[in-house]
């Protein structure tokens, strides 16, 4: 089995998991940004290299305001993986980039979404979620306010729902996924909790 992962960077726990999967006979290919990244938090130490194939590709901020790998359709056409694993915000490309859907369909690749569910509002409960879990920037200024913010969140929720409908499964950092993802139409058997663990059976 050949699995292609996209990451903004590779922290130690992901590196250990990828090495373990490679040792078990899974052919792992990882793509990460050619120059730095915009999706990994400050202070998170990155790992360079492993036993798996690690390549870089240009990352670009797209018209919808999030980072993406524009060359991902060409990468998939060349690598021909059985499974493509993408996390936030890269899985938004499934919605915004028809060429990506076409490339995956042409090689029968299954989509798996890596999610941080405790940062995802339940579908249809955006206002309630952000009232209970306010969003702040690094200067602790409140971001979750105003019509513009809630409109963006509503649109994002609908795009998430579309992307989840294309996925064969989800990998999640937290058991909160069992409470949140079904609201987007994800079946319980498609929800897999990995935590930040090197234990691939977790």
Role assignments for model-derived ranges:
Residues 1-56, 79, 107:
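N-terminal subdomain of nucleotide-sugar transferases
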Residues 3, 28, 111, 188-191:
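Hydrophobic anchor at the start of a short beta-strand
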Residues 6, 31-33, 112-115, 173, ...:
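Generic beta-sheet signal
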Residues 11-15, 38, 83-107, 111-129:
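An aromatic- and histidine-rich active-site surface loop
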Residues 57-102, 106, 153-162:
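An amphipathic, basic-hydrophobic alpha-helix
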Residues 110, 119-162:
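Nucleotide-sugar donor phosphate/pyrophosphate-binding loop at the beta->alpha transition
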Residues 149-161, 165-202:
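Donor nucleotide-sugar binding/catalytic pocket of nucleotide-sugar-dependent glycosyltransferases
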């Amino acid at each position: 089995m050949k699995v292609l992962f996209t990451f903004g960077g590779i922290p130690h726990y992901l590196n250990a998991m990828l090495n373990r999967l490679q040792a078990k006979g899974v052919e792992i290919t990882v793509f990460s940004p050619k120059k730095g990244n915009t999706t990994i938090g400050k202070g998170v130490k990155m790992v360079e290299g492993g036993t798996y194939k690690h390549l870089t590709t240009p990352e670009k901020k797209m018209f919808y305001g999030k980072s993406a790998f524009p060359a991902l359709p060409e990468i998939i056409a060349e690598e021909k993986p059985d499974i493509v694993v993408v996390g936030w915000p890269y899985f938004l490309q499934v919605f915004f980039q028809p060429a990506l859907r076409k490339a995956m369909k042409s090689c029968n690749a299954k989509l798996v979404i890596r999610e941080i569910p405790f940062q995802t509002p339940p579908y249809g409960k955006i206002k309630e979620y952000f009232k209970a879990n306010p969003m702040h920037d690094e200067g602790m200024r409140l971001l979750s306010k105003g019509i513009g913010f809630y409109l963006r969140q509503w649109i994002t929720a609908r795009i998430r729902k579309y992307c989840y409908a294309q996925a064969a499964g989800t990998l999640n950092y937290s058991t909160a996924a069992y409470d949140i993802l079904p609201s987007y139409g994800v079946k319980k058997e498609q929800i897999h909790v990995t935590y930040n663990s090197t234990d691939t059976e977790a």
